[in-house]
Each structure stands twice: as C-alpha cells, then as structure tokens.
Amino acid sequence: MSFCSFFGGEVFQNHFEPGVYVCAKCGYELFSSRSKYAHSSPWPAFTETIHADSVAKRPEHNRAEALKVSCGKCGNGLGHEFLNDGPKPGQSRFUIFSSSLKFVPKGKETSASQGH
C-alpha cells in the first residue's frame, strides 16, 4: 500500500484519454494527460504539472521525500508529490486523488479553465 490512505473510487487511475485534469473545486488547469502514466498505486500518477503555479507544495511531516500538494489557485487538497519516484530518474510522481480532479477532454480545455 502506498503512503496515502486509500479511500477507493479512484476513477482516473486507469483513465488515459487525451485532455486536461483540472481542479474539481475551481477549474484551474493542473495536469495534462501527456504527463499521466500507469503506476502500481491506486491513485492517478503524473510526472509534472501544466503550469509552474498549478500546485502549491508544503512538506509532509516526517517524510523528506514527500510533499503535500494543493491547487495553486484555490488551495483544494490534491494529494502528494513523491520526489525522485517518477518513471525516469530524477522525476517526481504526483499521486492525486480522483475526487479532487475533473477531466476535460482535448479541445474543451479553455472553457473548463474559465469556469464555463
């Protein structure tokens, strides 16, 4: 079992359609489907955010290799970033709760990020 507590219902774990994952609370763009990859944890995994300010990060208590991440716009809790745990050396793994995400299919990104 991974570091995060598993609550189930991770609808985006095996979801690989082209598009953008936005904050479920405010619609801010967080992750591109291009940065998503299959991982053994039960949560969706991403290697990088869309924008430098897509997420805010703060240290996880007693876990130097883990950071808590939240939406960079509204502060909605998203999950964790695990440093140097991505698919390639030096990459991070963002372990994100499906309930904190909304998926916007390719071609619909602009209207979703503007809250339409």
Swiss-Prot record:
It comes from the Eukaryota. GO terms for biological process: actin filament polymerization; innate immune response; protein repair. Gene3D superfamilies: Peptide methionine sulfoxide reductase (2.170.150.20). It catalyses: L-methionyl-[protein] + [thioredoxin]-disulfide + H2O = L-methionyl-(R)-S-oxide-[protein] + [thioredoxin]-dithiol; [thioredoxin]-disulfide + L-methionine + H2O = L-methionine (R)-S-oxide + [thioredoxin]-dithiol. This is Methionine-R-sulfoxide reductase B1. Methionine-sulfoxide reductase that specifically reduces methionine (R)-sulfoxide back to methionine. While in many cases, methionine oxidation is the result of random oxidation following oxidative stress, methionine oxidation is also a post-translational modification that takes place on specific residue. Acts as a regulator of actin assembly by reducing methionine (R)-sulfoxide mediated by MICALs (MICAL1, MICAL2 or MICAL3) on actin, thereby promoting filament repolymerization. Plays a role in innate immunity by reducing oxidized actin, leading to actin repolymerization in macrophages. The active site is at U95 (nucleophile). The gene is MSRB1. InterPro entries: Met_Sox_Rdtase_MsrB_dom (IPR002579), MsrB_Met_sulfoxide_reductase (IPR052150), Mss4-like_sf (IPR011057). Zn(2+) binds at C23, C26, C71, C74. SUPFAM superfamilies: Mss4-like. It comes from Pongo abelii (Sumatran orangutan). Truncated MSRB1/SEPX1 proteins produced by failed UGA/Sec decoding are ubiquitinated by the CRL2(FEM1C) E3 ubiquitin-protein ligase complex. Its main location: cytoplasm. GO terms for molecular function: actin binding; L-methionine-(R)-S-oxide reductase activity; metal ion binding; peptide-methionine (R)-S-oxide reductase activity. Keywords: Cytoplasm, Cytoskeleton, Immunity, Innate immunity, Metal-binding, Nucleus, Oxidoreductase, Selenocysteine, Ubl conjugation, Zinc. Binds 1 zinc ion per subunit. It is found in: Cytoplasm; Nucleus; Cytoplasm, Cytoskeleton. Its cofactor is Zn(2+). Belongs to the MsrB Met sulfoxide reductase family. Pfam families: SelR. One of its GO terms (cellular component) is cytoskeleton. Its EC number is 1.8.4.12, 1.8.4.14. Residues 1-106 form the MsrB domain.
